[in-house]
Amino acid sequence: VSNEQTSPVDPQAEVAPQVASHSLKHAVILGSIGFVAACLSSLAVGAMGEVFTLPPEIVQLGVGAVPGGDTQKIIVAASIAVFYRNSALWLATTGIIVGGLFGFVGGHGNNKSRIVRTVCAVIAGAAFGAAAGIHAVYYGEKCLELLKTGPLSVPESMVMQLHGTTWLIFGLGIGLGSALGSSQRRSAINKIAQGMLLGGIAAAVGGVLYPFVAGIAIPLIDPSIPIPLESNNRLLWMSLPCAILGLALGRRS
């Protein structure tokens, strides 16, 4: 009779690799969904164009206006106000698309929890997206004010802050929406905090990386524009944060 004893198998040791593999697979799926959402968002924003425009009476004021005069200041102020509204609408639309896709595909649970999660992600994405759009224009105004003082271009650190903070706000909303729809309510507060923190940081990383990647991929563009209007530039600006955001939220799930 053999005296050898077989060591007991640790169930956790067998499950851990499977969990890690599933988590990685889910991260890749959500990262891909993030890229698709960015493509759809860029197309939607391009199709929408400038929904809000200058009133005809303001446009008429610009005919023959003296540069630097009071009339010119009124036109500039009105143009900025229009850009605020368009930017809020553009990123709110982006938040709806990204939040909706992440909410529908991400996470677990039955059909009811999937619907709840999607609705929460759409609402939070729209609200925080609009806030991100407003912030982008506000910070963009700071960049313009800096250029008036003498520098020929906006410092890289300021450009990184512009896009990083804009996407930070956006990511907070997507992370919040994903956590609000969770079917597990015992640790709801922790899940919300983790979701917002992870979403905000992940999207901010994509925003910070954008100027560097854009400088290589599209070297002739101006990275200090708050919300890029050129299609390829806008797609790059949206896809980096959304893809990284998807990877992060998918890994957490």
Which residues fall in each region the model found?
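Juxtamembrane/disordered regions of integral membrane proteins
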Residues: S2-S253
